[in-house]
């Protein structure tokens, strides 16, 4: 549901147009805009960090060469209430799809896999005291690790939100 809401907001924002109503006679302006002109507002990669997903239900967003990694809403719902997070130490080097930790819940335990190759630069210390953040806010406060990535082209191999939603539907059938 959260993914649908994000997509709806992005669709709405992408189509916004600003229209100014003339309050005085429309006189030519030196830069070519006139009162009543239509200007489109655009959002792009510079403004929105795109969330990418793996088939194992991890996600990653990137900003300034650092990736933030977490698990998807689908994964946290399947796990149930998370009661313990096992995360790597800062400085750990990871390869794409390498196991880097685990989440334990009241229902099951699940391994975590790195979406990219790189080095862990930070772990979410709040999860030690409150592992339930993974359930309450899997895309914001419940992130797991931050990492530099050594091969940016690996991002292209991950699924977009739309592709991930289709993937989820295909495995639920």
From Swiss-Prot:
<keyword id="KW-0496">Mitochondrion</keyword>
<feature type="transit peptide" description="Mitochondrion">
    <location>
        <begin position="1"/>
        <end position="48"/>
    </location>
</feature>
<protein>
    <recommendedName>
        <fullName>Glycine cleavage system H protein, mitochondrial</fullName>
    </recommendedName>
</protein>
<dbReference type="InterPro" id="IPR000089">
    <property type="entry name" value="Biotin_lipoyl"/>
</dbReference>
<feature type="domain" description="Lipoyl-binding">
    <location>
        <begin position="66"/>
        <end position="148"/>
    </location>
</feature>
<dbReference type="Pfam" id="PF01597">
    <property type="entry name" value="GCV_H"/>
</dbReference>
<dbReference type="GO" id="GO:0019464">
    <property type="term" value="P:glycine decarboxylation via glycine cleavage system"/>
</dbReference>
<dbReference type="GO" id="GO:0005739">
    <property type="term" value="C:mitochondrion"/>
</dbReference>
<dbReference type="InterPro" id="IPR002930">
    <property type="entry name" value="GCV_H"/>
</dbReference>
<feature type="modified residue" description="N6-lipoyllysine">
    <location>
        <position position="107"/>
    </location>
</feature>
<dbReference type="InterPro" id="IPR033753">
    <property type="entry name" value="GCV_H/Fam206"/>
</dbReference>
<keyword id="KW-0809">Transit peptide</keyword>
<dbReference type="InterPro" id="IPR011053">
    <property type="entry name" value="Single_hybrid_motif"/>
</dbReference>
<comment type="subunit">
    <text>Interacts with GLDC. The glycine cleavage system is composed of four proteins: P (GLDC), T (GCST), L (DLD) and H (GCSH).</text>
</comment>
<dbReference type="GO" id="GO:0005960">
    <property type="term" value="C:glycine cleavage complex"/>
</dbReference>
<dbReference type="InterPro" id="IPR003016">
    <property type="entry name" value="2-oxoA_DH_lipoyl-BS"/>
</dbReference>
<comment type="similarity">
    <text>Belongs to the GcvH family.</text>
</comment>
<keyword id="KW-0450">Lipoyl</keyword>
<comment type="function">
    <text>The glycine cleavage system catalyzes the degradation of glycine. The H protein (GCSH) shuttles the methylamine group of glycine from the P protein (GLDC) to the T protein (GCST). Has a pivotal role in the lipoylation of enzymes involved in cellular energetics such as the mitochondrial dihydrolipoyllysine-residue acetyltransferase component of pyruvate dehydrogenase complex (DLAT), and the mitochondrial dihydrolipoyllysine-residue succinyltransferase component of 2-oxoglutarate dehydrogenase complex (DLST).</text>
</comment>
<dbReference type="InterPro" id="IPR017453">
    <property type="entry name" value="GCV_H_sub"/>
</dbReference>
